[in-house]
């Protein structure tokens, strides 16, 4: 402990005595969103204020990103809460970056970025996503994690490594929120199977620069960002099975990812691509299910009569391809194609009777085939929304690039439940001035 204090004191003294410079930037945003049908407010959290502060001192850089998130209070807020606050302070990033002759080192709360395509890369999985901001771009829709990262440079090669001792999960909308995308279930904390030991996450990558672009290989190992259905236990009071309850059990699968990516520059056109293969498995076996107590009134429902762990083992892949080209009148076109599919699925079955009610699951027992409700716990942020999508974008800048216009569309080309020739689509028009 004394040695750590001495090292910190030396580091702070060197920062104070040497020349340093600071950089600040941010935004203040007021917006309003409502339904076209009836004009009612769509009450979702949004970032009211954001401030980035960078403190640079020779070979040391301290980066921070502070945001204020606002959400309108419900009219019944003060019936159960005395706090007048309607905002949350979010320290999105705070880390130390050290530059050396061989590369750089980062440690702290970091938003990591992997992959080659601009958005929706299946390789970009180190930092979890904030699904309240899923339609934002770049790091705005991602969350920082307490971690460390090392990048090593050697000629045309780059090697990187990242490590976190914490299991990091996506931020998903709550059941009562106005967010248009809903999860199939909203489990309680006591319905989860705990992860044994330290949930270490780590990954590494290597890239090589070529004459016309670059290629890269990525590997990551960690627990899923989204929860999964792990199995079912049936409890009763002693030997009497006339009043039994079904305990739905959730967990986080263990997943390994192997990905490849490339950037190719041909004339005024650019091709980018990322592809990832995922191997995931539920590590909870029969013994863990047998040791588990009921999540509902365990003193009454104290006897386990049936146990059905799923023991899922799944292989799946995701691919994102991107094409960019400059059109006449200095208009920049970007097209992106995303696809995802399950290659191999194995699990045990759930032998449930038709008269058994499954709370919180918006599907019938007949549809409760584990393969049908499988959701990828890693990959692109739109992987839980659709298996195939296309994104088209036109961007134009004027006034020396101070005024920017961007027209974008997201097409759900996997949606087969539409009557017209146009699939599900989201259109957006953005403008910015700086």
Please tell me what each predicted stretch does.
Residues 22-30, 60-64, 105, 159-161, ...:
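Transmembrane beta-strands of outer-membrane beta-barrel proteins
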Residues 36-39, 78-84, 132-136, 188-192, ...:
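Extracellular loop and loop/strand-boundary signature of outer-membrane beta-barrel proteins
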Residues 54-178, 211:
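Outer membrane beta-barrel
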């Amino acid at each position: 402990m004394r040695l750590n204090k001495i090292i910190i004191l030396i580091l702070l003294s060197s920062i104070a005595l040497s020349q340093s410079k600071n950089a600040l930037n941010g935004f203040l945003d007021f917006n309003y969103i409502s339904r076209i049908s009836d004009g009612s407010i769509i009450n979702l959290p949004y970032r009211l204020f954001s401030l980035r502060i960078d403190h640079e001192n020779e070979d040391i850089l301290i980066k921070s990103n502070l945001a204020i998130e606002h959400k309108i209070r419900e009219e019944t807020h003060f019936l159960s809460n005395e706090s007048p606050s309607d905002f949350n302070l979010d320290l999105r990033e705070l880390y130390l970056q050290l530059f050396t002759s061989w590369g750089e080192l980062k440690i702290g709360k970091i938003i990591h970025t992997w992959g080659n395509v601009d958005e929706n890369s299946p390789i970009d999985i180190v930092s979890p996503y904030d699904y309240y901001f899923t339609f934002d771009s770049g790091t705005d829709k991602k969350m920082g994690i307490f971690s460390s990262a090392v990048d090593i440079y050697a000629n045309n090669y780059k090697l990187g490594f990242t490590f976190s001792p914490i299991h990091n999960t996506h931020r998903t909308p709550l059941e009562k929120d106005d967010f248009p995308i809903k999860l199939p279930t909203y489990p309680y904390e006591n319905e989860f199977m705990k992860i044994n030991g330290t949930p270490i996450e780590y990954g590494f990558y290597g890239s090589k620069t070529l004459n016309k672009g670059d290629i890269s290989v990525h590997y990551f190992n960690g627990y899923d960002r989204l929860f999964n259905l792990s199995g079912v236990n049936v409890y009763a009071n002693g030997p009497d099975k006339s009043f039994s309850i079904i305990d739905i059990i959730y967990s986080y699968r263990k997943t390994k990812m192997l990905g490849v990516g490339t950037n190719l520059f041909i004339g005024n056109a650019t091709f980018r691509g990322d592809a990832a293969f995922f191997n995931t498995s539920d590590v909870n076996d029969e013994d863990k299910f047998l040791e588990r107590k009921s999540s509902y009134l365990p003193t009454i429902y104290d006897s386990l009569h049936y146990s059905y762990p799923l023991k899922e083992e799944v292989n799946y892949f995701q691919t994102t391809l991107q094409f960019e080209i400059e059109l006449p009148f200095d208009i920049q076109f970007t097209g992106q194609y995303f696809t995802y599919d399950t290659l191999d699925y194995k699990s045990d079955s759930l032998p449930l009777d038709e008269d058994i009610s499954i709370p919180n699951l918006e599907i019938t027992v007949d549809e409760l085939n584990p393969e049908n409700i499988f959701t990828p716990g890693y990959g692109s942020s739109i992987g839980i929304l659709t298996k195939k999508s296309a994104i088209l974008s036109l961007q134009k800048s004027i006034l020396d690039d101070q005024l920017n216009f961007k027209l974008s569309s997201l097409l759900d080309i996997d949606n087969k439940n539409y009557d017209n020739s146009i699939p599900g689509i989201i259109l957006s028009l953005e403008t910015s001035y700086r």
